């Protein structure tokens, strides 16, 4: 299970969601400013920490060895997270994936392989 924090939209009952995936060595803390900067009142923001510790931050996969197993594991964890978001009322058609660096790779990996279409992929 991934560590997450939902920053609710200013508009009550909004079903629009942006899932934010940070880069190597960062964390969700590095993106707390994003909802305020975007100023989109209908947008809920889900900040997500990658699963692996990395020098005080987090990593989505091992950059020094074979990356494939880590990418696959993180993809599966993100699929589970997105399935839970769908169950909680956030349809994938109203969900954006946003990623930077390693988070961008995961955005593309998940966005192109998840069985449901997203509103958009941002990297």
Residue ranges with predicted function:
Residues 98-103, 107:
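Gly/Ala-rich beta-loop-alpha elbow adjacent to hydrolase catalytic centers
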Residues 44, 94-96, 120:
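Proline-centered loop/turn at the N-terminus of a beta-strand
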Residues 116-123:
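A conserved short beta-strand
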Residues 27, 113-114:
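A short His-aromatic
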Residues 20, 99, 123:
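Conserved SAM-binding loop
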Residues 33, 109-113:
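Active-site signature of alpha/beta-hydrolase-fold catalytic machinery across serine-
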Residues 1-92:
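Serine-hydrolase catalytic machinery in alpha/beta-hydrolase-like enzymes
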Residues 57-59, 107-110:
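Short, conserved acidic/polar surface loops in the N-terminal third of protein domains
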